[in-house]
C-alpha cells in the first residue's frame, strides 16, 4: 500500500534494505575481523536496539566467502541445538551428540580448506543454559581458526558471564559490545537515510513529526521503524504525502504505544 501510494520501487524501512548507522558499521567490521582468528563475540542490547539489524548485515556481508549458520531457537537442550546447527551446516544429524560434534568439526575443516570463513550465530543466547553454551564453546574450540562464534543476547547474558563459576566462558570472549539506545538525532538520521534509500524526499516527514518519532521511540531502533511506517500508513489513509504531527499522534494513540498509566486514565 505504501509503495503504491508513494510511487516507490521498494518498500521503505525493509530489513533487507537498512543502511547501518556508523556505530553499527563499526561493530560489523570488528565481527568480520574476528572471523579470521577464531573469535567468540558477544553482542548485547535491550530489545529494539539494533541487534537484528547487525545480525542480518553479517549474514548479507559476503554469503559466498563468509558462511553464517544461525540458531534462532535457543530454548532447547544441548543436543537439540547440535541438531539445528547440523541442519544449518547442511549435515544430516546423527542421533548421538558426539557424532554430531564430529560431523560439525569435519564440515568446518572442509570449509576452511575452501578458503571460506565461518560465523555461526546463536540468537537469544541469554535463553540458553550456560552449560549448553559451555559445551558448544568446547566444540568450536576444535574448529579451525577461520570462525567466529557470535552470541546475540539481552544484557542478562553479561550478568551470567560475570559469575565466577562461568569464568571459563568469559575468559574466552574475544570481543563484546553493549548496544546503546539511539540519541534523538541518530533516530532522525536513520529515518532520513531510509528515505534516501527509496528515493523519497526528506520533506516527506515534517521536522515536528521527526522530532516526535525520535522522542516517542525512546531510543529503540525497532520503535523508530515501526512508528515511521505506521505514520506513513496514516498518511495513505489521509490521502496526503506529507507526514505531520496529526499522523504520528494518531499512531501514538493506539493502545500498544501508550503506557499502562495512560491506559488507566
Stretches found by the model and what they are:
Residues 108-132:
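Conserved P-loop NTPase "ATPase switch" module shared by AAA+ and STAND
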Residues 36-57:
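Walker A/P-loop nucleotide-binding motif
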Residues 23-34:
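Pre-Walker A adenine-sensing motif
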Residues 40-47, 99-102, 128-129, 142-167, ...:
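Sensor-1/coupling segment of RecA-like P-loop NTPase cores
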Residues 8-16, 66-68, 76-95:
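Conserved NTP-binding/hydrolysis module of P-loop NTPases
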Residues 46-47, 68-77, 154-155:
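A short hydrophobic beta-strand->loop->alpha-helix junction that borders the nucleotide-binding pocket
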Residues 2-7, 17, 29, 54-56, ...:
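C-terminal alpha-helical "lid" subdomain
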Residues 71-74, 161-163, 174-187:
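Conserved AAA+ ATPase "SRH/arginine-finger" region at the nucleotide-binding site
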Amino acid at each position: 500500500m505504501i509503495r503504491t501510494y508513494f510511487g516507490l520501487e521498494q518498500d521503505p524501512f525493509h530489513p533487507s534494505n537498512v543502511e547501518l548507522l556508523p556505530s553499527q558499521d563499526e561493530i560489523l567490521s570488528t565481527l568480520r575481523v574476528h572471523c579470521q582468528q577464531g573469535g567468540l563475540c558477544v553482542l548485547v542490547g535491550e530489545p529494539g536496539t539494533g541487534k537484528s539489524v547487525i545480525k542480518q548485515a553479517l549474514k548479507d556481508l559476503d554469503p559466498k566467502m563468509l558462511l553464517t549458520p544461525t540458531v534462532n531457537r535457543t530454548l532447547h537442550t544441548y543436543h537439540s541445538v547440535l541438531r539445528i546447527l547440523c541442519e544449518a551446516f547442511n549435515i544430516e544429524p546423527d542421533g548421538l551428540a558426539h557424532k554430531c560434534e564430529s560431523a560439525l568439526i569435519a564440515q568446518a575443516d572442509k570449509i576452511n580448506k575452501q578458503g571460506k570463513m565461518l560465523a555461526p550465530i546463536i540468537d537469544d543466547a541469554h535463553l540458553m543454559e550456560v552449560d549448553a553454551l559451555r559445551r558448544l564453546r568446547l566444540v568450536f574450540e576444535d574448529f579451525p581458526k577461520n570462525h567466529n562464534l557470535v552470541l546475540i543476547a539481552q544484557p542478562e547474558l553479561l550478568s551470567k558471564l560475570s559469575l565466577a563459576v562461568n569464568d571459563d566462558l568469559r575468559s574466552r570472549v574475544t570481543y563484546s559490545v553493549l548496544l546503546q539506545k539511539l540519541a534523538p538525532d541518530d533516530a532522525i538520521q536513520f529515518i532520513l537515510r531510509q528515505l534516501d534509500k527509496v528515493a523519497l524526499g526528506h520533506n516527506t516527514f515534517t521536522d515536528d513529526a521527526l522530532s516526535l518519532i525520535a522522542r516517542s521511540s525512546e531510543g529503540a531502533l525497532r520503535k523508530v521503524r515501526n512508528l515511521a511506517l505506521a505514520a506513513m500508513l496514516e498518511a495513505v489513509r489521509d490521502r496526503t504525502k506529507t507526514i505531520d504531527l496529526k499522523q504520528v499522534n494518531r499512531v501514538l494513540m493506539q493502545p500498544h504505544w501508550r503506557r499502562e498509566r495512560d491506559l488507566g486514565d
